């Protein structure tokens, strides 16, 4: 079983709230840079007042003091979970963990799902990269620094679950139905596969938001996330 997080990848808060009115069973939402920049912290408060848990996906990567301050601010506005880049370094991660104080789950971003091996190698200035090993390396750093979990693609879930044990939260974007296009994410899978491999949270956006019937699409994904015997 896993939690389903709806990515509110919409241009305006009003659009997101209209969509949420159609999904009364939803428990988790993801707020990313677009909505946060346009709507601000009050939008997060609006969501929490509706009883929703907010996954603040801003992927912080800055000097330790700045990131610790951002973590404190996220905790104060009621976010339940937030992301930061594992490549920010041990000092940044450890400082963030202290600032979270146990009230905010910190999730380390490893290799973005938009990357495939050759593109990631170019991005980091290497001749070649083994993405699963890179994800594993970054996840180990995150866990050792005191973070509660990591973000990875569906392709690395089983590796991290075996390597890091049952306690680590594994948040997985790139979740699609078999009939859905992958769009700009290159490492994708179905909800059923991700749950079977040990994911704890699944992030779904466009397959629900852009569906002809978002409520029906949401229920379809919910059935797969609750499939403990997958």
Question: What kind of feature is each model-predicted range?
Answer:
Residues 3-7, 28-30, 53-55, 80-81, ...:
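Structural preference for beta-strand elements that scaffold enzyme active sites
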Residues 6, 29, 59, 82, ...:
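Conserved, mostly hydrophobic/aromatic
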Residues 8-9, 32-36, 84-85, 149-150, ...:
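Glycine- and other small-residue-rich loops at beta-strand/loop junctions that grip anionic moieties
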Residues 8-54, 64-70, 140, 154, ...:
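Conserved alpha/beta-domain cores
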Residues 26, 50, 77, 145, ...:
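Structural motif
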Residues 62, 66-149, 153-158, 163-171, ...:
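Conserved anion-binding
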Residues 77-89, 176-177, 184-217:
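Glycine-rich phosphate-binding active-site loops on the catalytic face of alpha/beta enzymes
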Residues 93-99, 195, 208-230:
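C-terminal helical cap(s) of enzyme catalytic domains, especially alpha/beta-barrels
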